[in-house]
Amino acid sequence: MNQALRVSVRFFTTLREVTGKKEENLEFPKGETVTVSNVLKRLAENYGKGFTEYVYDIKTGEVKGFLQFLVNGRSISSFNGLDTKLEDGDVLAIIPPVGGG
């Protein structure tokens, strides 16, 4: 039986509104290299324009710099950024900026 690699994604504030969820569980084929970038692309496919426009700069196609990403509670900046590889059971949190002023 072919097992899947499972990753949980947690959404906060605006992304909860965009997705209508607090959490999404994604499955990828076992053996596939899964990165934060791959997960974002899958989420963009699943949630469409609202998610895509919130996460990506439409002009450059790059992920917007104001978003923070944590893998199992640690910032991806301490790993390999968007190329950080994810393992089965990892939790990716996507955290928009907290408003203030």
Predicted regions and their residues:
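Ubiquitin-like/PB1-type beta-grasp interaction modules and other compact soluble beta-rich domains
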Residues: 1-100
